[in-house]
Amino acid sequence: MSSSQTQSPPTDVARRQQTGTAVRSEDNHRNQLENIAVGKLTKSEGAPAQQNVIIAKEVVINNHFNFNXAGVCVCRFVLASVVKEFNLGDFDLLDSVHLDEDTGHRCRLSRAIGVLDRSDTKIPKDRHTQWRQVAGLPEVESSADVAWKQNPELFEPTRLSLDPTRSETVPPLREQPAPCPKFCLQCQQQLLTRFSRFQCVQGLTSRLERRPDTLGRPNGWQHNHRCGIQLCSTLCASLGRHSQQTPLADTFPWHSSPITCYQYPLGWRMLPGSCPQLQ
């Protein structure tokens, strides 16, 4: 069920009581998180009966990327707050976020989010098929699905602990920080195009630059995704993951702008705000 098909109850309380959906909004930026269907407990195929899997069907952030006060839209932040509110324990992110092709001001998860309780429930081996079926997602493949098939290693779930005392559950990053040139090359090769949140995605940056954000800034996508090193460190650490603090300006001479802080499927990354070699 998508947000466009759901009639919103008049209040957050009513929505939680009636559908188990949590809504968070920020008046200053007119942001609305719709249809986080934490909702029903569903038995995972192949798992013991007492082990339940909670599915969040779809996450849609309307209007633009300014979801939090830092001007950083990271769906994992949103999901983490919902998981924490419902005391659901750890969860795994099985998909990436992408830009709305029409407006450039939306990010969503095109596949299911599996929220695991504190049992030993395992993620199904055939995540691409089984999770979509359990979550009731459409069978039509998105660009994210195609890229996942071609490069499944890029989408391996990254366990995130919401309890700082359980930091040992957070695996170390498999790569060193500041891999922007490498991933820009992947963007150039069309592996992550249209749902990656890099500014260096070919064909996206120039188009989005022409669309003012709701605060009247001409380059809304770029501005809304940039944050300072200290801010990134604080935000990332608040979710139980040690952020990378490599001084990118010293590593990459061409880096002269604020850096981008966001969630990549392999772990937290702080990357230069642009890749001029592709612009």
Curated annotation (Swiss-Prot):
Q: Which UniProt keywords apply?
A: RNA suppression of termination, Transport, Viral movement protein
Q: Where is this region: Disordered?
A: 1-29
Which stretches does UniProt call biased (Polar residues)? 1-22
| Gene Ontology BP, a term | transport of virus in host, cell to cell
Q: Which family does it belong to?
A: In the N-terminal section; belongs to the carmovirus double gene block protein 1 family.
Miscellaneous note of the record: Readthrough of the terminator UGA occurs at position 69.
Q: What is this protein called?
A: Protein p31
List the source organism: Maize chlorotic mottle virus (isolate United States/Kansas/1987)
